Swiss-Prot record:
Quaternary state and interactors: Interacts with UvrB in an incision complex.
Main subcellular localisation: cytoplasm
Name of the coding gene: uvrC
Organism (species): Photorhabdus laumondii subsp. laumondii (strain DSM 15139 / CIP 105565 / TT01)
Lineage of source species: Bacteria, Pseudomonadati, Pseudomonadota, Gammaproteobacteria, Enterobacterales
The protein, known as: UvrABC system protein C
Record Gene3D superfamilies: 5' to 3' exonuclease, C-terminal subdomain, GIY-YIG endonuclease, UVR domain, UvrC, RNAse H endonuclease domain
Residue stretches making up the UVR domain: 204-239
UniProt subcellular location: Cytoplasm
Family matches, as InterPro entries: GIY-YIG_endonuc (IPR000305), GIY-YIG_endonuc_sf (IPR035901), GIY-YIG_UvrC_Cho (IPR047296), Hlx-hairpin-Hlx_DNA-bd_motif (IPR003583), RuvA_2-like (IPR010994), UVR_dom (IPR001943), UVR_dom_sf (IPR036876), UvrABC_protein_C (IPR050066)
Primary role: The UvrABC repair system catalyzes the recognition and processing of DNA lesions. UvrC both incises the 5' and 3' sides of the lesion. The N-terminal half is responsible for the 3' incision and the C-terminal half is responsible for the 5' incision.
GO BP, one annotated term: SOS response
Membrane-spanning segments: none
Family according to the record: Belongs to the UvrC family.
Gene Ontology cellular-component terms listed: cytoplasm; excinuclease repair complex
Length: 610
């Protein structure tokens, strides 16, 4: 415990009411946030003569100040605690690494409702179905739904400005409500009702209604309509047969935890209307010495209470562990949602099967993660010995990407001792250089990256430069000329050059501190970690360059065609439904656009293709 903090004097002033406390270090940074039913009793426990936890011992040594906020109830304290954790990200708290809001399928409340993926606060009128574990699951579902129930998925701006049906109508993926006369209001609303029932888990009602429609069409001798309903029935049946359904309309989150070697995996199974929407594994950042109870309690608080306004909470949460403050969490979630939310730890029947499934997934996911971490640490140890450092905590790598010198993008990727830190990846648009001058591009990105104040924790131990001696020379020149307060001599500069035929495994390393190069054997663990960070940087640069190039092309391709002015550009995009359908169109299809002659259509076709 530091001499600066007088715990005895402080504790005399603390109330015994419920509330939240924030602990600060010498720099004024919040290092821990906690809550208590009795603030005085809880805070006194940190300053006992004997502290059994290594984590608590380390925490107390760094405390120089404590602030408390009194609340009316424990529930208020729990909510405030997790708001503070999200705000301050204290290093001694268990931190959920990914607190993005979850994606939903959104059915709008328009005259002709649209189906779309949505993430964020629910400001728009309509219905939200989910949550889904990730955007990929939503996109897959939207593709499937478009095949089953062809209602529109286009943006309102496109829908309102159409005079002819787009490609989705032509291939049977949309009924074309944008064009009058293609579909009746009743028929479109039918499909919307089917989607609403289907997403609510009422598959049998959908099938019953479709069968009634098919029989009705057949009796009226409308055989084409009957055949269409028949195909739709078959498609819905194929989908429902593939789904694991509990036979009930359960809305559940099923959570299991696996804990080993200082790492935890919490696996969440999302079940809505009796259907498994998907699952996701979480690996929270855990301070050394943290107990499993604290890991679980903090994870659940952050998972459900942070960003709860954007989330549809389930009616029940199943856990495979005893929760010390189960009632407080249940009351808090019930208060937020406006309905009772139950937390169960000993379910039976189908619910017990769900819990067993989550437990199996948590165990497998943690085992896989530990295996990967072991491999990463072995490779990092090998690299540490190669570069003769005591330890490596942070590495950064740079690459340049462009096409014939145009739309040049530089990438910077960051690795720590556990692998990629993707949240810290950055891209830099390069400008003001001679097109194609990779040396100047590298010089510019390094000056922009390092020619400013850096926190001690952000100074890399190694900087890899994708390139040979020339690129490394640029890095050396930049660092020699830097006028900064942080230790610019700390990072080791290493150039990574591929062999003459640019095959992986034939890389040559150039060191700024030594006038020699090294070619590591292909099976070298150190080489593998270098290849990994170099490939990440390369891919990050290429992706950024392609996005920048695509953006430029999308706005400039049509503008560069002689005879295509603003009005014709607008007509082409409006008639074809956007640039991508226009790219895919034939000369004959382009020539059907009003004011576009066949000769001009050929010119447009060739410009877009070449």
């Amino acid at each position: 415990m530091t001499e600066q903090f007088d715990s005895k004097t402080f504790l005399k002033t603390v109330t015994s009411q419920p509330g939240v406390y924030r602990m600060y270090d010498t720099s004024g940074t919040v290092i821990y946030v906690g809550k208590a039913k009795d603030l005085k009793k809880r805070l006194a426990s940190y300053f006992r003569a004997q502290v059994t936890s290594r984590k608590t011992e380390s925490l107390v040594k760094n405390i120089v100040q404590i602030d408390v906020t009194v609340t009316h109830t424990e529930t208020e304290a729990l909510l405030l605690e997790h708001n503070y954790i999200k705000l301050y990200q204290p290093r001694y708290n268990v931190l959920l690494r990914d607190d993005k809001s979850y994606p939903y399928i959104f059915l709008s409340a328009d005259k002709h409702p649209r189906l779309a993926m949505y993430r964020g606060a629910k400001h728009f009128k309509g219905e939200y179905f989910g949550p889904f574990p990730n955007t990929h699951a939503v996109r897959e579902s939207l593709i499937l739904l478009q095949k089953l129930f062809p209602i529109r998925q286009c943006e309102d701006s496109v829908y309102r400005n159409r005079s002819r049906p787009c490609l989705q109508y032509q291939i049977g993926r949309c009924l074309g409500p944008c064009v009058k006369g293609l579909v009746s209001e009743d028929e479109y609303q039918q499909q919307v009702d089917y989607i609403r029932l289907f997403l609510s888990g009422k598959d049998q009602q959908v099938l019953t209604r479709l069968i009634e429609r098919m029989e009705q069409a057949s009796q009226q001798l409308k055989f084409e309509d009957a055949a269409r309903y028949r195909d739709q029935i078959q498609a819905v049946r194929q989908v429902t047969e593939r789904q694991f359904v509990s036979g009930t309309d359960d809305d559940l989150d099923v959570i299991s935890v696996a804990f080993d070697a200082g790492m935890a995996c919490l696996h969440v199974l999302f079940i809505r209307q009796g259907k498994v929407l998907g699952s996701r594994s979480y690996y929270p950042k855990i301070p050394t010495g943290t107990t499993l109870d604290e890991i679980v309690q903090t994870f659940l608080g952050q998972f459900y209470l942070q960003g709860s306004q954007n989330r549809t909470l389930p009616s029940e949460i199943l856990l495979d562990f005893t929760l010390p403050e189960k009632d407080i969490l249940s009351d808090s979630l019930s208060e937020i949602s406006g309905r009772k939310i139950h937390i169960q730890t000993r379910p039976r029947g189908d619910k017990a099967r769900y819990l067993k499934l989550a437990r199996t997934n948590a165990t497998i996911a943690l085992s896989t993660r530990l295996s990967q971490q072991s491999t990463i640490h072995q490779r990092l140890d090998s690299l540490t010995k190669l570069v003769k450092l005591a330890k490596i905590q942070r590495m950064e790598c740079f690459d340049i990407s462009h096409t014939m010198g145009e739309q040049t993008v530089a990438s910077c990727v960051v690795f720590d001792s556990n692998g990629p830190l993707r949240s810290e990846y950055r891209r830099y648009n390069i400008s003001g250089i001679t097109p194609g001058d990779d040396y100047a591009a590298m010089n510019q990105v390094l000056r922009r990256r390092y020619g400013k104040a850096l926190d001690e924790s952000k100074i890399p131990d190694i900087i890899f430069i994708d390139g040979g001696k020339g690129q490394l020379a640029q890095a050396i020149d930049v660092f020699q000329s830097l006028d900064v307060e942080w230790d610019k001599t700390r990072p080791q500069l290493i150039g990574v050059a591929k062999g003459s035929d640019r095959k992986a495994g034939l890389e040559t390393l150039f060191f700024a501190t030594e006038d020699k190069s090294i070619a590591l054997p292909p099976d070298s663990p150190a080489l593998h970690v270098i290849q990994h960070i170099r490939d990440e940087s390369h891919n990050h640069a290429i992706t950024g360059h392609r996005q920048r190039r695509s953006k430029v092309r999308n706005t400039s391709t049509l503008e560069s065609i002689e005879g295509v002015g603003p009005k014709r550009r607008q007509m082409l995009l409006k008639y074809m439904g956007g640039l991508q359908p226009l790219r895919n169109a034939s000369v004959e299809e382009i020539a059907k656009v009003p004011t576009i002659s066949y000769a001009l259509a050929e010119k447009i076709y060739n410009a877009l293709k070449h």
